Amino acid sequence: MIKAKIEDSGMPPTRAEIARELGFRSANAAEEHLKALARKEVIEIVPGASRGIRVLRHDEVEAKGLPLIGRVAAGEPILAQEHVETHYEVDPALFKPRADFLLRVNGMSMKDIGIMDGDLLAVHKTQDVHNGQVVVARVDDDVTVKRLDKQGSQVLLHAENEDFAPIVVDLTHQQLTIEGIAVGVIRTADWM
């Protein structure tokens, strides 16, 4: 609706126009929806202007860097938080393939390949994965980072630390979703 108004008239709608168009009783309801869109980085609100709405282009959102999404277990799986905690000003093109988001590692199960507790794991969002790749996997509602080994209807998610046994997933009884592949690590200053 906002884009259509800008295309038709050359300027964004007022809060009152948005409220009327969407059937809200007041402009305050429209303002709350605009704030939600701004939090999701779809629009930018220009303070103090009744028509102070700017639709962000996708490349402008990318310019803010990579989003940090929750935490990922590198040990026992934990429930992932699905909201963006913050953005880091890191060029996604530094990683091959290109990183789509960052996850904070929790645990030491991947330490033997240099993924440490507290690291930021750069992840390329894909479900096209192969055995031997380090993946971010969701088993039921838990998220973990492990090395993939698919054998028929069974998947082994291997740790890179001999103190941890593999996670065995029986695809006939459990749900497994691949969230992406690890494409890099950013070490935080916590280890110094």
Swiss-Prot record:
An example Gene Ontology molecular-function term: serine-type endopeptidase activity
Organism: Photobacterium profundum (strain SS9)
Keyword DNA repair set for record: yes
InterPro entries xref list: LexA, LexA-like, LexA/Signal_pep-like_sf, LexA_DNA-bd_dom, LexA_repressor, Peptidase_S24_LexA, Peptidase_S24_S26A/B/C, WH-like_DNA-bd_sf
Gene from which this protein is expressed: lexA
One Pfam family, short name: Peptidase_S24
Record keywords: Autocatalytic cleavage, DNA damage, DNA repair, DNA replication, DNA-binding, Hydrolase, Repressor, SOS response, Transcription, Transcription regulation
Function: Represses a number of genes involved in the response to DNA damage (SOS response), including recA and lexA. In the presence of single-stranded DNA, RecA interacts with LexA causing an autocatalytic cleavage which disrupts the DNA-binding part of LexA, leading to derepression of the SOS regulon and eventually DNA repair.
Designated name of the protein: LexA repressor
CDD domains the UniProt entry points to: S24_LexA-like (cd06529)
Top enzyme class: hydrolase
Reactions accelerated catalytically: Hydrolysis of Ala-|-Gly bond in repressor LexA
Annotated site residue numbers, Cleavage: A74, G75
E.C. code: 3.4.21.88
Active-site residues, Swiss-Prot/TrEMBL: S109 (for autocatalytic cleavage activity), K146 (for autocatalytic cleavage activity)
DNA-binding region: 15-35
A Gene Ontology biological process term: proteolysis
Organism phylogeny: Bacteria, Pseudomonadati, Pseudomonadota, Gammaproteobacteria, Vibrionales
Assembly information from the UniProt record: Homodimer.
Family, per entry: Belongs to the peptidase S24 family.
